[in-house]
């Protein structure tokens, strides 16, 4: 008679009784009872009686040993959690043996089982014996083999000894050799030391010699400098002597002429003629002598350039002097400024009157680092001469000195001009012929005619000095005024001419036409232009090297024997050239830095570019009467009209005449003070043209025509063009025509006038450059367009082979390139050096010009250039960078791209060597490029390339193919996977021609590994809650083994597989656009794709699947949005395919539970799916049923599943369930053994009667603060960012990273605050945050999305949860009462305060937007305007004081990290900062749990009692929430909230019910203090009692209330039942402790450390 629950398995303890059982069975088989005699029958009866007695003894022995040994061996390894042991113990400890019914079968069956076990053991022994025999045979064979091996071993040992002897001899020999070699090494080392010592000595000698050599070099350079200085002085003296000689010769010639005239006059006198001419001759001679006496002796003087007077004029011998030429833009190859004639300094006429010596009325700032430079010896004076005194013969103004800015003219100055006078008049030369005045008047317009800028300048009053001119006063006055006004119009720079930023400065005499590019520079700042020649050395005639101004200034062509080219850069003012020792390209101050006139400022007017004809032809009167000329004492010189005298003008200046009169100090040898002509006292002047007795001939007009064209003076140019007989195609010695000068300087109107006048459009200069070449080089695209329209030769090649297209490319002029290409120019022309336009444009590094040259197509012939171009002809430069082939194919052929110059360099060589990576990339896009082409030095493009360009070339033909991970088709909608992406880009692979399949396989594997590590690491997540990160599993379990297949386009490929073609050829031919990696999914019985799609670690999903397969009844529960539905469906799908692979048919049945889902519907579902089977019917084999019940939180679990709990646990016919059918009949059913039941509950914890269901299911809790939910959002958003950045991980400083981190912190802080408020029903899972937008550079979109999420989801849930808690009537059934339909004023205020606190502490805190932008979005959030100080100032007052408690205080959100404004929240008392939560588990309250919580229970029990007693006595419902909100407001840092995360869900307390008489009766004084000594033994007693008393009575609830714990009465009365049930329930389904009772969260202590229950 076995006890209940005994197992039927045999045991070794029954072995001794086996023979008795065998002998008992034998008589039944061998004897026939009917044939036996009496004696035999008696014998048999005695034997059988003995057997019965023996059998009884066996049974008793078995029973005794069962209790002692069998149970211990069978169940000794189980702990108290085994339900079977609990049942056995209860059964045995219950009633006596007589009352028990046998649970197991007859003891005979036990004996039979023992005998059967013995037979099995005998068979097993036989097999083992046979095996032992075979092993013995093998052992003998091995012994024989061992003996043979020993013999071989002996032989080998003998050989080894022989070898050792031989080796010893060899070792001895080696040792001897080593000793010899070591001796040699020592000797060599000694020699080496000696040689090194000698080497050091030689180095010292060498260094000494080098020092001596450097000293000698310094001496030689000093000597060379002295020799150069002396040579320059000798040159200067020679030039001065030549000038003096030429003047003496000229003077001699004049004297001869006068002698001739005297002779003629004597003859006339003899004839009785008039003698008046003899009176003027001595005067002229005297004047000439006076002028000649001062030539070449004085240094440069500072003169005024603001008055307009005639020049002092001298005659010179033109035949002996060649013109001095100054090129404004010198070429490094043509430095020629030679002074072949006079080389003297400008001097002042010693006979000049005081009133005619003009001082500096407007000082100019000196150039930067200007130093005094004495030319031809030191100057005695340090300041400019006072204008009121005549300069002594040796007096000179220092070139570098100038009056300070803003200083007025010195007292005593007789300057006739001021800031208020637009122009100052000067007296005409006395005795000037009226015909000359008429000639001067001929070229002038009306004095009051508007100029080019539309301005009219009135004529100032004239100043007459000489009384000899009074007889011609009217005519001279009119002529002088007109000339002055016209010159004021022609000599000012044009306004508004935009400077072109720098291009390569090439000179007139070089291989390219001059390219002058300047801008208005900062005043006083010296700038060195790249490519300019070095500055002119001192003591040489010349000017500093500066580019031309934006408006062409006065240019005077001169020659010098020893000086390099020079020019002065003048920005809208009159200045002399800076010293030649200044850095090259130094800029002179511009007009903005000058003192402004108080009179209305007129725009600047164009200046004249004056060039002297090479033949010495005179220039008309327009060029002579200029600002800054010194008044002459000489009454008039009657020279020939067409004088051949040379014009020596050492500097170039421009004036802002009639606007801001400016005086400049002469800063360079040879610098002059006159504005336009700048002729000094020694210089032969232009005024003889005007002083002659006859009209000015047309021989000087071509030079003036060139100047007008170069300066853009349309008025003068049009007047000159209207004259008859003028050669408009006249060229100077450099071959520059007027059209060339106008085109070079970009004067479109002048070009149009000249072209209309039929100027030669293709006239070339001496270097072969046409006007189109000059305009293209300078970038004047309007001139280029005009010249092309007049049929200019677009493919004209200069002497060196440069075409206009080449020059435009060389200087990077994109508009000119475009115009020339549209005109059909030839792209294939080459220069003499073998350079093509492609070479030229690549050499500049201009990407846009290169794209135009390569891709811009010429329009069809016949299209007008003025018509708007069709859009198809315009190449999109920006889009072209990505895929120019998609927009347009290259126009230029491969031969041109690969054309090599004289050195063998292609355009790719140039781009690579200069590091122009963008240009090289564009060249590489041309399919015909040959990167392996070698130059004359046998170097490829890669050999000469920089590092960046080498990397580009190495990836030249590389295919950039994206790698994407696909998880297959994600089932739509209702499973919570709307935000999951089917494919994600992880990287881009560069596949080169040399890439092998092994390399490709490794690259794919490495890319996958890096991607999985990147999305699972927390590299750039700066989270405040570090405790949560410590528990996060950084590895999601994916690797290359998770890959199911890899698709190369549409071709499947596996890692390690090789095709006949290389990867590059394969990708090219199959047009593979992407590599898709397919992960193993549920269809293959794996969960890798589910892991990647949901970011839930793989090992957790596998654990969930194991629980389902093991327990078959599993429910997933967690806060809403925890992806329960998705997880369950994916697990069901995986389980289905696994079972189908094992040969089972499987079916998934899904039911969505709602409030109207009844038990009958559930029964029908079970029956229809064959999950419930009638008792009489056998189950269907090889069939699996998976039933999914969604949204179980919407129904009552106890009502829905209460009757099925036991049948679900024991699935057999022995535990059926009775089902009522609709017709009133009932039937018995049982559950199919292969039926899996899964459910989902969107609820953080269970309450009430739902706890009765809990122990019958396996529960999987998805906590928001634990894996997998805790890290899911972080991993998901990180993967989203990586996908958005095409596989790259952005830096932590990126705005996207900050925004994503903010969204993650919002979710965590929000749940922290909600758990702290005790509203677990409002907790949110990560699902709602998966749709966070990731838009690089647009954080506003994320904030807008957050506001919509707050308004649509978060705020309504929080409002509902707060109202339900605030309006709760403290009834036992938590969750069953709802909020009031009409909440009170206090409840509404609590809700508003809670929303405001949550918004500011959880949502807006940490937002990456600036404060100003955040304020714009704050209004979008619902409930953010509540004054938070009301929460802090609220007291638990009675209803009648409630309105007074809620004071309106103006507060704003608390400033956090300088982002929010400071709060006015009141700080709560630290002792009451938070009401401390306690957790008392009533169902499983053992002593250890009590001790772990005892310390926190003792510390603050009195505070909790005060609140609970107050609530129990009927105080305000919202007091507890207000207290909680107060503590949240008073927390000084957000970490206070995040610290709650570790213990918030584990610390629970039961509501103290207002209708609990047992508890209320024990509390007589709500304010009664409770000491810790009283609390400690009570709490300990209570927990011990609950653990040890298995038969507690209902009255024990009253004694429990005496322990002052807030336990509701309803729970206390059920203590005995729950305790008994818990002791007998199956603990294999491990129960969540904190879900065993209805509970409510309260404020937690910051420092409480509570042990979490084991899952």
Curated annotation (Swiss-Prot):
SMART domains in the cross-refs: ANK
One Pfam family here: AAA_lid_NAV1
GO cellular component: actin cytoskeleton; cell cortex; dendritic spine; FAR/SIN/STRIPAK complex
Entry keywords, A to Z: ANK repeat, Cell projection, Coiled coil, Cytoplasm, Methylation, Phosphoprotein, Repeat, Synapse
Keyword Phosphoprotein: yes
Disulfide-bonded cysteines: none
Record's compositionally biased regions (Polar residues): 445-457, 479-491, 574-584, 1550-1565, 1573-1591
GO molecular function annotations of the record: protein phosphatase 2A binding
UniProt key word Zinc: no
Region (Disordered): 1-30, 201-224, 270-608, 1442-1478, 1548-1655
Residue list for modification Phosphoserine: 1515
Comp. bias (Low complexity): 377-416, 492-505, 1616-1630
Quaternary structure note: Interacts with CTTN/cortactin SH3 domain. Interacts with STRN, STRN4/zinedin and MOB4/phocein; this interactions mediate the association with the STRIPAK core complex and may regulate dendritic spine distribution of the STRIPAK complex in hippocampal neurons. Activation of glutamate receptors weakens the interaction with STRN and STRN4.
Protein's name according to its UniProt entry: Cortactin-binding protein 2
Protein's organism: Otolemur garnettii
Bias type Basic and acidic residues, positions: 1637-1655
Signal sequence residues: none
């Amino acid at each position: 008679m076995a006890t209940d629950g005994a197992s039927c398995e045999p045991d070794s303890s029954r072995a001794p009784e086996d023979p008795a059982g065998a002998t008992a069975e034998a008589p039944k088989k061998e004897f026939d009872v009917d044939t036996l005699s009496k004696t035999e029958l008696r014998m048999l009866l005695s034997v059988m009686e003995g057997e019965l007695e023996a059998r009884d003894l066996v049974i008793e022995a078995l029973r005794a040993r069962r209790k002692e040994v069998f149970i211990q061996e069978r169940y000794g390894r189980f702990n108290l959690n085994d339900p079977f042991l609990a049942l056995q113990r209860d059964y045995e400890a219950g009633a006596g043996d007589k009352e028990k019914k046998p649970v197991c079968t007859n003891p005979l069956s036990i004996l039979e089982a023992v005998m059967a076990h013995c037979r099995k053991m005998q068979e097993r022994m036989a097999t083992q014996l046979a095996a032992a025999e075979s092993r013995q045979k093998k052992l003998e064979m091995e012994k024989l083999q061992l003996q043979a091996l020993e013999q071989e071993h002996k032989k080998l040992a003998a050989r080894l000894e022989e070898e050792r002897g031989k080796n010893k001899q060899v070792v001895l020999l080696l040792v001897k050799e080593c000793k010899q070699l070591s001796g040699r090494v020592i000797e060599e080392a000694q020699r080496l030391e000696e040689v090194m010592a000698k080497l050091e000595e030689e180095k010292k000698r060498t260094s000494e010699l080098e020092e001596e050599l450097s000293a000698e070099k310094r001496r030689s350079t000093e000597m060379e400098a002295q020799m150069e200085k002396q040579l320059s002085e000798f040159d200067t003296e020679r030039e001065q002597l030549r000038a003096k000689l030429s003047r003496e010769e000229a003077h001699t010639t004049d004297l001869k002429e006068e002698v001739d005239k005297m002779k003629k006059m004597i003859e006339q006198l003899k004839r009785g003629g008039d003698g008046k001419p003899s009176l003027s001759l001595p005067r002229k001679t005297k004047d000439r002598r006076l002028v000649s006496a001062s030539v070449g002796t004085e240094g440069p003087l500072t003169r005024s350039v603001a008055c307009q007077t005639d020049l002092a004029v001298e005659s010179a011998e033109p035949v002996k002097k060649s013109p001095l030429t100054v090129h404004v833009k010198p070429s490094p190859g043509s430095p020629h400024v030679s002074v072949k004639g006079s080389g003297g300094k400008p001097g002042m006429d010693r006979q000049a009157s005081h009133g005619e010596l003009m001082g500096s009325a407007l000082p100019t700032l000196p150039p930067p680092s200007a130093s005094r430079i004495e030319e031809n010896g030191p100057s005695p004076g340090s300041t400019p001469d006072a204008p009121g005194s005549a300069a002594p013969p040796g007096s000179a103004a220092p070139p570098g000195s100038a009056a300070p800015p803003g200083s007025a003219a010195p007292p005593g100055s007789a300057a006739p001009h001021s800031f208020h006078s637009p122009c100052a008049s000067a007296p005409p030369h006395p005795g000037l012929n009226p015909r000359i005045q008429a000639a001067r008047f001929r070229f002038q317009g009306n004095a009051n005619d508007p100029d080019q800028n539309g301005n009219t300048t009135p004529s100032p009053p004239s100043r007459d000095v000489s009384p000899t001119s009074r007889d011609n006063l009217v005519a001279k006055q009119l002529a002088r005024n007109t000339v002055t006004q016209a010159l004021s119009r022609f000599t000012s720079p044009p306004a508004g001419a935009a400077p072109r930023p720098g291009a390569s400065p090439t000179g007139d005499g070089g291989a390219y036409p001059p390219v002058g590019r300047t801008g208005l520079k900062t005043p006083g700042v010296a700038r060195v232009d790249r490519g300019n020649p070095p500055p002119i050395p001192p003591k040489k005639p010349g000017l500093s090297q500066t580019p031309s101004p934006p408006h062409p200034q006065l240019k005077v062509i001169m020659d010098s024997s020893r000086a390099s080219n020079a020019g002065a850069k003048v920005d809208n003012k009159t200045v002399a050239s800076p010293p030649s020792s200044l850095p090259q390209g130094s800029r002179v101050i511009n007009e903005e830095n000058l003192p402004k006139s108080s009179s209305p400022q007129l725009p600047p007017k164009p200046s004249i570019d004056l060039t002297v004809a090479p033949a010495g032809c005179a220039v008309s009167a327009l060029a002579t009467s200029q600002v800054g000329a010194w008044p002459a004492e000489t009454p008039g010189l009657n020279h020939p009209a067409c004088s051949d005298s040379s014009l020596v003008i050492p500097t170039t200046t421009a004036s802002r005449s009639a606007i801001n009169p400016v005086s400049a100090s002469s800063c360079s040898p040879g610098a002059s003070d006159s504005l336009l002509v700048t002729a000094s006292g020694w210089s032969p002047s232009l005024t003889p043209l005007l002083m002659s007795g006859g009209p000015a001939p047309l021989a000087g007009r071509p030079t003036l025509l060139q100047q007008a064209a170069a300066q853009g003076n349309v008025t003068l140019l049009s007047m000159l063009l209207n004259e008859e007989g003028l050669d408009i195609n006249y060229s100077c010695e450099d071959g520059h025509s007027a059209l060339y000068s106008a085109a070079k300087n970009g004067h479109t109107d002048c070009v149009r006038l000249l072209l209309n006048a039929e100027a030669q459009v293709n006239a070339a200069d001496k270097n072969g450059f046409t006007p189109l070449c000059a305009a293209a080089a300078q970038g004047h695209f309007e001139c280029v367009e005009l010249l092309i329209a007049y049929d200019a030769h677009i493919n004209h090649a200069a002497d060196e082979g440069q075409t206009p297209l080449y020059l435009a490319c060389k200087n990077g002029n994109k508009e000119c390139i475009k115009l020339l290409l549209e005109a059909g120019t030839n792209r294939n022309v080459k220069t003499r050096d073998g350079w093509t336009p492609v070479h030229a444009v690549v050499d500049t590094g201009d990407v846009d010009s290169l794209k135009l040259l390569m891709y811009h197509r010429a329009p069809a012939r016949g299209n007008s250039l003025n018509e708007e171009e069709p859009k198809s002809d315009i190449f999109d430069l920006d889009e072209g960078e990505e895929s120019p082939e998609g927009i347009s194919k290259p126009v230029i052929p491969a031969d041109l791209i690969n054309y090599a110059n004289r050195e063998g360099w292609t355009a790719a060589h140039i781009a690579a060597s200069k590091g122009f990576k963008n240009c090289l990339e564009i060249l590489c896009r041309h399919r015909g490029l040959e990167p392996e082409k070698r130059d004359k030095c046998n170097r490829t493009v890669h050999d000469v390339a920089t590092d960046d360009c080498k990397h580009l070339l190495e990836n030249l033909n590389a295919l950039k193919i994206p790698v994407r991970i696909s998880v297959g088709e994600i089932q739509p909608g209702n499973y919570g996977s709307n935000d999951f992406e089917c494919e994600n880009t992880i990287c881009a692979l560069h596949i080169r021609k040399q890439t092998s399949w092994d390399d490709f396989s490794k690259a794919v594997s490495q890319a996958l590994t890096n991607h999985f590590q990147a999305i699972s690491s927390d590299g750039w997540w700066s989270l405040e809650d570090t405790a949560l990160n410590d528990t996060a599993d950084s590895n999601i379990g994916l690797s290359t083994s998770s890959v199911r297949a890899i698709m190369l386009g549409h071709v499947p490929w596996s890692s390690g597989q090789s095709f006949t073609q290389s990867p590059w050829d394969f990708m090219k031919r199959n047009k593979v656009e992407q590599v898709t990696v397919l992960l193993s999914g549920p269809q293959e019985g794996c969960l890798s794709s589910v892991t990647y799609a949901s970011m839930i670690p793989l090992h957790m999903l596998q654990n969930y699947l194991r629980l389902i397969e093991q327990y078959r009844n599993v429910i997933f529960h967690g806060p809403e949005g925890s992806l329960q539905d998705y997880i369950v469906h994916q697990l069901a799908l995986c389980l289905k395919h696994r079972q189908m692979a094992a040969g089972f048919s499987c079916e998934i049945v899904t039911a969505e539970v709602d409030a109207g889902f009844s038990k009958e519907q559930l029964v029908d579902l079970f029956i229809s799916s064959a999950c419930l089977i009638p008792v009489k019917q056998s189950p269907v084999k090889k069939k699996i049923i998976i039933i999914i019940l969604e949204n179980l939180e919407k129904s009552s679990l106890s009502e829905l599943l209460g009757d099925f709990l036991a049948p679900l646990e024991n699935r057999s016919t022995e535990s059926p369930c009775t089902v009522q059918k609709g017709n009133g009949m009932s039937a018995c059913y049982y559950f199919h053994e292969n039926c899996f039941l899964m459910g989902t509950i969107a609820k953080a914890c269970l309450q009430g009667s739902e706890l009765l269901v809990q122990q019958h299911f396996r529960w999987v809790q998805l906590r928001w603060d634990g894996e997998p939910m805790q890290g899911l959002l972080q991993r998901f958003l990180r993967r989203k960012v990586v996908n958005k950045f095409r596989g790259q991980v952005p830096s932590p400083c990126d705005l996207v990273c900050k925004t994503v981190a903010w969204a993650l912190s919002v979710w965590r802080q929000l749940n922290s605050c909600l758990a702290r408020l005790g509203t677990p029903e409002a907790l949110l899972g990560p699902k709602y945050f998966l749709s966070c937008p990731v838009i690089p550079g647009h954080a506003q979109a994320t904030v807008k999305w957050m506001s919509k999420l707050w308004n649509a989801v978060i705020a309504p849930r929080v409002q509902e949860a707060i109202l339900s808690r605030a309006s709760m009537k403290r009834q036992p059934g938590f969750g069953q009462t709802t909020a009031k339909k009409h909440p009170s004023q206090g409840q509404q205020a609590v809700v508003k305060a809670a929303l405001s606190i949550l918004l500011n502490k959880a949502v807006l805190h940490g937002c990456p937007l600036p404060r100003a932008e955040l304020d714009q979005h704050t209004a979008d959030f619902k409930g953010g305007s509540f004054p938070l100080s009301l929460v802090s100032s609220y007291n638990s007052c009675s209803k009648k004081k409630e309105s007074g408690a809620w004071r309106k205080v103006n507060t704003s959100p608390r400033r956090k990290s300088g982002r929010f404004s400071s709060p006015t929240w009141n700080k709560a008392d630290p002792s009451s900062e938070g009401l401390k939560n306690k957790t008392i588990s009533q169902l499983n309250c053992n002593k250890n749990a009590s001790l772990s919580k005892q310390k926190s229970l003792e510390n603050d029990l009195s505070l909790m009692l005060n609140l609970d007693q107050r609530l129990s006595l009927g105080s305000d419902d919202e007091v507890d929430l207000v207290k909680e909100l107060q503590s949240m407001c008073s927390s000084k840092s957000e970490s206070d909230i995040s610290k709650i995360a570790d213990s918030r869900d584990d610390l629970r307390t039961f509501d103290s019910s207002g209708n609990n008489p047992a508890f209320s009766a024990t509390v007589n004084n709500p304010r009664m203090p409770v000491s810790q000594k009283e609390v400690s033994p009570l709490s300990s007693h209570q927990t011990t009692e609950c653990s040890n008393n298995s038969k507690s009575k209902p009255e024990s609830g009253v004694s429990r209330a005496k322990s002052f714990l807030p336990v509701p009465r309803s729970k206390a009365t059920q203590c005995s039942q729950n305790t008994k049930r818990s002791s007998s329930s199956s603990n294999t389904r491990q129960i969540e402790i904190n879900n065993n009772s209805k509970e409510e969260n309260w404020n937690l202590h910051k420092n409480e450390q509570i042990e979490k229950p084991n899952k």
